[in-house]
Curated annotation (Swiss-Prot):
Natural source organism: Thermoproteus tenax virus 1 (strain KRA1) (TTV1)
Taxonomy, superkingdom: Viruses
Lineage summary: Viruses, Adnaviria, Zilligvirae, Taleaviricota, Tokiviricetes
Protein's UniProt name: Uncharacterized 16.6 kDa protein
Amino acid sequence: MKYKFAIGFFISPSEFLLYNDYKKIRTIYNTVRVGGIDREVRVGIAHFMEGEYRIYIEGIPITVYRGDKTSASIYMSWGNWISMYNLSLERFLWAYNAKAIVIRPTGFKRGEGCLRRVLDEIDAGVYSGGRLLKPTIVQLREE
């Protein structure tokens, strides 16, 4: 069974919250398979300043693969963030046996424009999952 888009697929544009010109955050609820059980988790994306993006996933252990090919396993409590400041982050986050979405900040023009366009396309259900190079978005799927 293949899941729909892990970030943004079920969210309307009104749920893209604008705090100020430098901080945009989006909270998404998704069903992922964790330890053989489907559960809903909270996932967020934020743009804080040029070149810096953060995501968080509620309450599940993940491994972050960075551009230098090092990795770090982090247990994410609710509201904790993974910072992706100027990282060439091309690979995935792993949540048990599920593949979760990651955004890649490399090449963004002042950050907001490309990210917002992709989020808008996901809202409309037309994002191809491969047509755009930045950010890179991967579908959730069962292993």
